[in-house]
Amino acid sequence: MVFRRNTRVGVYVDVANLARNGGYGMRYDVLREFACRGDAEPVRLNAYVSFDPERAEQDAAYREGQYAFYSLLRDFGYKVIQKNVKWYTDESGNRFGKANADLDMAVDALLQSENLDRVVLATGDGDFIRVVQALQNKGCRVEILAFENVSADLRRE
């Protein structure tokens, strides 16, 4: 008798990348259902979000909207990993914010892959090519979910 366990799946969502590239209004409950198709067991559901503390201090609607969104993600079973926006000024005096969660997402996926059969990366960012290759080398099936502006190299991988 052959014992077949359910497929163990991990979902890693770059929320800002999806929102910027056609995924605004993403149905995270549907994403979970899609990832767990075929009776797959969700071992890890991570959502990487950016948060601007300066803006939240001045804009109650932004703050409350973000907190409500994070609460919704948690209700769907996602672990919310928050990256605070850091503000920089370039040599021309232009101010810009950055809250890049790519490294956190990559490290988490690689560390947790020991317990996964399939990894769903919800991002179109070409920086994840080596992560995809490393996960595949570890024996994981990797699926990419993205909408617009998907890296051509990532599509091929």
Give the residues covered by each predicted segment.
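Domain-level signal for Mg2+-assisted phosphodiester chemistry and nucleotide/NA-binding surfaces
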Residues: M1-G97, R141, E148-V150
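Active-site histidine-anchored catalytic micro-motif
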Residues: N100, E114-R156
